[in-house]
């Protein structure tokens, strides 16, 4: 653990970017988290990945960071977003930060599933482990300052009243 006031070394070299690496990294990280909750594994969905790519490009183009209102179209897609400094995060680090929210997860009825009392502290994680979700597709886009990761899920998770274990 770093000492107070001492920042850990950060690797500033550009991170590898490749669609095959993105797919394998995302599937592995999602399914490892899901395995811990006995949720069935997700399969990659190219249509979801295309939707994610369109939205990631829009976020990068507009330099905004907000959920896509169109993800609510029928069928409603679940969505996880990440934004970080350009080339500072590998794919594993991007998804790892979302999975790390699991440290605040507590079993219960959604949205009462956070040990902090705030569902926003676990919302990415609960979508990742959502047992009814079966498919995922992710994509990234970059602008001069940031990398954006968008993951889409079907069926969507984070449904109020559902019990998570």
Which sequence ranges carry the predicted segments?
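Short edge beta-strand segments in beta-sheet-rich domains
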Residues: 76-78, 146
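Disulfide-stabilized extracellular recognition modules
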Residues: 87-165
């Amino acid at each position: 653990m770093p000492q107070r006031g001492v920042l850990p070394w950060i690797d500033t070299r550009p991170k590898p970017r490749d669609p095959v690496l993105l797919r394998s990294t995302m599937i592995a990280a999602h399914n490892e988290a899901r395995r811990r909750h006995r949720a069935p594994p997700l399969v990659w969905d190219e249509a979801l990945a295309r939707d994610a790519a369109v939205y990631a490009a829009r976020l990068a183009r507009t330099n905004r960071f907000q959920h896509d209102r169109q993800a609510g179209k029928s069928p409603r897609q679940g969505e996880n977003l990440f934004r970080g400094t350009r080339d500072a995060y590998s794919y594993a680090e991007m998804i790892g930060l979302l999975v790390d929210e699991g440290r605040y997860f507590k079993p219960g009825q959604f949205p009462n599933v956070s040990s902090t009392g705030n569902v926003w502290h676990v919302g990415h994680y609960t979508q990742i482990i959502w047992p009814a979700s079966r498919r995922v597709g992710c994509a990234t886009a970059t602008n001069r300052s940031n990398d954006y990761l968008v993951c889409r899920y079907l069926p969507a998770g984070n449904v109020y009243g559902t019990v998570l274990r």
